Amino acid sequence: MKKLLFLLLALICMSTTASAAKVICGDERTDVWVPMLRGKKVCLLTNYTATINGKHLIDVMLEKGINLVAIATPEHGLSGKASAGAKIASSTYKDTGIPVWSLYGKTRRMTSEQAAQFDVLVFDIQDVGVRFFTYYVTMLYTFDALADQGKRLIVFDRPNPNGMYVDGPILEEKHKSFVGGLPIPVVHGLTMGELAQMAVGEGWVTKVDVEVVCCQNYTHQTRYQLPVKPGPNVRTMQAVYLYPSTCLIEGTVFSEARGTDFGFEAYGHPDIAPTGFSYTPRSIEGAKNPKHQDKLCHGVDLRKVPKNQILKEGFTVKYVIDAYNRYGKGEELFAGNRKHFFHRLVGVDYIYEMIIAGKSADEIKAMWRDEVEKFKVLRRKYLLYEE
């Protein structure tokens, strides 16, 4: 019966796609979700990306008379201004008295006591479709509490800007962490609604009733332009497309250009030979105390790499290999706790080992090709939109 309901939902979602029409996100479909939420006590898991024509979903819900009893927020907070990894305190929303629960503070999991205070949890956050982008993990970390209290999740779905392809190694269980919550490729090609249903369907998380308010006029080949930046250091579509590969620089001693206005669109280090391009990371909003703060970094500028080329190439370790060669100090590229974090990002051991052994990016990419093809078949069961 549940398989039949999922198939029906998928057919409904797919029937609303049209490549030429404007994409309509789930939260814009007030005619669908207002009746679903009317008379319910609602908790909204969200951040600054949940806007409808410039107005935040929180305010739209209140205007529509929805009984919003709590707001929960992920990494970077409701405003999106907190730096990566910075703990965020709980607060209240404006002058409404509605509590804002930080799920990136003393705890990263919703408690059963919190879940007891509402009837339904709504999730609406713009993601980038990458395994180490943490918003989906925050969503999954609510499932235990929801299941304990018998509460359901409604996802107001949004397009995946990297949803056109699937690439990268499958996360190994021993490397599971907050930057890798599921056994999926680095670029998984799923929307948050699809991913939530896959996680439940495959038994990867505690079973929760998940409903999805689908996007309209969207397919997985839609080149969706994000109306707002999805993170404080992912500011442009160039950064969104580069992020799956350049985020690996975080697992090295090189700068990933945090502390500039082109984060993840460049990388560099103070101690390599001049390259003709340099930048100086500064402590700025959303990037407090970046690597090599106030030091001139020589490096590589990726801002003019054609977007079609980035997408065609997919997930690659070539930037880490380039940093390794430019640095010239072998394993010191991963000094301190960087090696451990690099393993968490890539989700496997062999990438590090092959880089040290001098293997090429193409040789390394060949290692995950077969498992990605198998994942694509599994993924297809949960697609709500045409491929």
Where are these regions (language model features)?
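Short internal beta-strands
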Residues: 69-75, 156
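Glycine-rich oxoanion-binding loops at beta->alpha junctions
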Residues: 89-117, 130
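Conserved functional hotspot residues or short segments at active or partner-binding sites
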Residues: 263, 268-369, 387
